[in-house]
A protein has these predicted regions:
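Residues forming the flavin
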Residues: 2-78, 82, 124-129, 134-465
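Dinucleotide-binding Rossmann-like beta1-alpha1 core, especially the glycine-rich loop
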Residues: 55-57, 63-116
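Glycine-centered helix-coil hinge/cap
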Residues: 88-95, 99, 117, 147-148, ...
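Structured alpha-helical segments in the cores of large, soluble enzyme domains
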Residues: 95-102, 119-133
């Protein structure tokens, strides 16, 4: 027999969690369906080095907290990047929303974690000048760095805060969304039918492909997003201290001379660690930094954004194909010295060992990224290093390590109203999996928007943010 709830939320990432937080005091019956583990089981599995490797890898991208649960916990407190919510509201509204999201993270344990970017105005101006001289755009941001360990504690506190009328079902992937006569009915998950008045789809990056197919089957208009493909860079932390000491997170954007492609840095982790990420069986790379554990290196991604034109409309499949080549050649991520890339030769374990940069992910296979990345992408990345070296001397060192590949998959973007509602009444789509956000802060903010919209519809509006 079908079970009924007022609200069903698909996905327990930041978008889904913040929707539930906004609704928690309304008395509505709420069901959160999550394909991965609940937070305590998830943390335990992440620490269990004896657990099957496949289970540990899958645990990285799904479960309570979403793909960001084991990230380095960066809250990007800016409207300049991190998503496209400014397409649905003005920047002033978005800034207030992000500030509110930050206050919620602080309330659950983030208070006291350092905010970068409020000081060093003169030094930031000088960095912008140097970047411009190198054909780079330097985009600083205010960042609250929670750290991977503190981020896990915050997610646990959030999980524990929900009253009894909020039900969480972990290990329960949603199979289908139910719509009848143009109205949302509920979902089928784990062989059970769950009916609802309001449906919030927050499937996350790991559920992006599934959600795109569901949206298309329901006749919802979608548009393909770009795919970002590149490498994770690792260098001695001292090289990037002139940037990271004054601005923990920033973006450097470059348009390549050869192809006019947009190339950018992403997710800089001072004194951090390179890690593997499991995307439905495909092993890619990412980076973390911790509040209480440090390495001697800084890592970040260099990504090339590619927006495909008609007739091609499967950027996710293209990105998966590139990642599969690295897996085929290296059995997982490949690592190569920048100097070996320039010299047209593969890296060997011996050359990596003799290098000046000691890898924080020793499990990566020394290899040849030119056999994986298309020429266009590799050329763009090499040009980016030449430009970076003018801002951070040493960036273009032959000892710099490149791990590949790093791929950022973005769901096809669903056509939404300013309330983040699909054309099907009371069916909302939010977060990275809906193609409208790209980070913790804006994904969380999207959840607040929908939570408050549902509050308004049931006659319990919340105050202005």
């Amino acid at each position: 027999m079908a079970k009924s709830y007022d609200v069903v939320i698909i996905g327990a990432g930041p978008a889904g969690i913040f929707t539930a937080l906004e609704l928690a005091d309304t008395g509505l019956s709420i069901l959160i369906l999550e394909k991965g583990l609940d937070i305590r089981e998830r943390i335990a599995l992440n620490r269990d080095r004896t657990a099957p490797a496949a289970d540990r890898r899958a645990n990285i991208v799904s479960g309570w907290g979403g793909a960001g649960a084991f990230s380095d916990g960066k809250l990007t407190l800016t409207t300049d990047y991190g998503g496209n919510l400014d397409d649905y509201m003005n920047k002033g509204e978005l800034a207030r929303l992000i500030s509110y999201v930050d206050s919620v993270y602080c309330r659950f344990g983030g208070e006291g974690r350092q905010v970068y970017g409020d000081e060093h105005r003169d030094k930031i101006h000088e960095l912008k000048r140097k970047a411009a001289a190198a054909d780079l755009a330097f985009i600083p941001a205010r960042i609250r760095h929670l750290g991977t360990d503190v981020n896990g504690e915050i997610l646990t506190h959030m999980r524990d805060s929900f009253p009894s009328h909020v039900t969480v079902k972990a290990n329960c992937p949603v199979d289908h969304i139910l719509v009848k006569d143009g109205k949302v009915e509920g979902v089928i998950a784990g062989g059970e039918t769950y009916l609802c008045k309001y449906l919030v789809a927050a499937p996350g990056r790991d559920g992006a492909e599934w959600f795109t197919k569901e949206a298309e089957s329901l006749g919802l208009h979608t548009a393909s997003n770009a795919v970002d493909i590149g490498v994770r860079v690792e260098s001695p932390a001292e090289i990037y201290e002139p940037i990271t000491d004054i601005c923990y997170e920033s973006k450097l954007v470059y348009f390549s001379k050869s192809f006019d492609d947009r190339v950018r840095t992403f997710c800089m982790n001072p004194y951090g660690f390179v890690v593997t990420e499991n995307n439905n069986g495909l092993m890619t790379v990412n980076g973390h930094s911790y509040a209480h554990k440090k390495s001697g290196n800084t890592n970040f991604a260099i990504l090339v954004s590619k927006q495909f034109t008609q007739p091609f409309h499967e950027p996710i499949e293209y990105g998966k194909y590139i990642a599969s080549l690295a897996n085929m050649l290296g059995g997982g991520p490949i690592v190569q010295r920048l100097g070996d890339v320039r010299d047209g030769r593969r890296s060997t374990a011996e050359r990596i060992r003799r290098g000046l940069v000691h890898p924080t992910m020793p499990s990566a296979t020394p290899g040849d990224l030119s056999l994986v990345l298309p020429y266009r992408f590799l050329k763009d990345i090499m040009e980016m290093f030449e430009a970076l070296d003018k801002v951070a001397p040493g960036a273009n060192s032959r000892h710099t390590l490149l791990y590949g590949v790093e791929v950022k998959f973005y769901s096809s973007r669903i056509e939404l109203s300013n309330q983040l509602e699909t054309k099907i009444p009371n069916f909302f789509a939010i977060g990275d999996g809906a193609g409208i956000t790209r980070g913790l802060a804006q994904a969380s903010a999207a959840g607040v928007v929908v939570g408050r919209e549902i509050c308004a519809r049931i006659g319990k509006p919340k105050g202005e943010i």
